[in-house]
């Protein structure tokens, strides 16, 4: 005899064969996703962790190639051809683009929050310590901000349960938006009677707004923000308080003031309603004090406090005045951004 032999009554659970990563790794229809999971992106390490639960949205090679993504083995590089204009991107830029999309297809779901997609909801993608972007679902269709721009969705065409979560097979990508959040705000304000109309009307006439591309000064593509938009009644309230230009008696706004001092009031008001570098929602994931785009008279940062819990989202200004989100008209997706409608305005005082 040269050793001992022990029998077991349970197979050792390997991360590679019992996790949502397995759904891609063991199926030749998903070689492109598997390649980027394994190329040092850290995605494999995330989704193969059987001690945490995830939901994975998995596009096949056919889906990826149909939307312009492929890997050139002869050149050892990723390649992307835009389905819209045929523009070709290769190398690290193409890889980064696909990596962003596939990271938004990974969602930390410790309580199985996405096991039933027949209803509707919004959730943050990525793992808990490295947030992705917010995505939505409705009646077994999943959307990113880019899908809303393109007018499509990723449909669920099947699923597979693993030890650490569920894999959904999808017929489209969960796309990110390449438009300025100003475009999304403009679209929200467009319908007759829109509650975003008053705020947007001040914005589009302000020094912060560039009609070419609907760009907002200080708001850069690819950076996280939260837009806190007072509804029409809150804007009227701000006018009556002299916080915004208009008739202080009737509350009728003057969206395009001629005096420089009033123009500055508008610009500062708008900046204070945009949280910089953070995206917050009514999910309890982020709370505390967050920087806004506004600077004080000394050029220092200003802050707004955020209270967040399941179904709760409140913004509090320096004077301790609060603005509560309006659930039916909040959590609108934009580029790494959420746009919320609130029932009050925020005011910075020095």
Where do the model's predicted regions map?
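Mature, structured domains of secreted/extracytosolic soluble proteins
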Residues: 1-350
């Amino acid at each position: 005899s040269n050793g001992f032999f022990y029998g077991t009554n349970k197979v050792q659970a390997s991360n590679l064969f019992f996790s949502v990563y397995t759904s891609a790794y063991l199926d030749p229809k998903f070689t492109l996703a598997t390649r980027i999971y394994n190329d040092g992106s850290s995605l494999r390490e995330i989704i193969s962790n059987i001690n945490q639960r995830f939901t994975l949205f998995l596009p096949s090679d056919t889906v990826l190639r149909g939307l312009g993504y492929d890997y050139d083995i002869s050149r050892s590089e990723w390649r992307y051809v835009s389905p819209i204009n045929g523009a070709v991107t290769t190398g690290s830029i193409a890889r980064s683009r696909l990596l962003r999309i596939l990271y938004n297809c990974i969602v930390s779901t410790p309580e199985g929050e996405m096991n039933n997609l027949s209803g509707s909801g919004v959730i943050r993608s990525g793992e808990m310590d490295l947030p992705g972007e917010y995505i939505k679902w409705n009646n077994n269709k999943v959307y990113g901000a880019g899908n809303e721009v393109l007018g499509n969705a990723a449909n669920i065409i099947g699923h597979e349960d693993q030890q650490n979560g569920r894999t959904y097979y999808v017929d489209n990508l969960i796309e990110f938006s390449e438009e300025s959040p100003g475009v999304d705000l403009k679209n929200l304000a467009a319908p007759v009677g829109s509650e975003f109309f008053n705020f947007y009307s001040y914005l589009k006439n302000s020094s912060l707004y560039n009609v070419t591309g609907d760009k907002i000064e200080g708001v850069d593509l690819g950076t996280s923000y939260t837009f806190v938009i007072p509804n029409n009644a809150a804007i009227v309230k701000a006018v009556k308080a002299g916080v915004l230009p208009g008739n202080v008696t009737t509350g009728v706004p003057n969206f395009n003031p001629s005096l420089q001092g009033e123009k500055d009031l508008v610009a500062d008001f708008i900046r204070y309603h945009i949280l910089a570098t953070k995206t917050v929602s009514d999910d309890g994931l982020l709370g505390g004090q967050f920087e806004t785009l506004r600077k004080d008279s000394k050029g220092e940062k200003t802050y707004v406090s955020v209270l967040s819990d399941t179904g709760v989202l409140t913004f509090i200004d320096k004077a301790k005045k609060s603005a509560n989100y309006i659930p039916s008209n909040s959590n609108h997706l934009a580029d790494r951004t959420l746009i919320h409608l609130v029932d009050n305005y925020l005011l910075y005082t020095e």
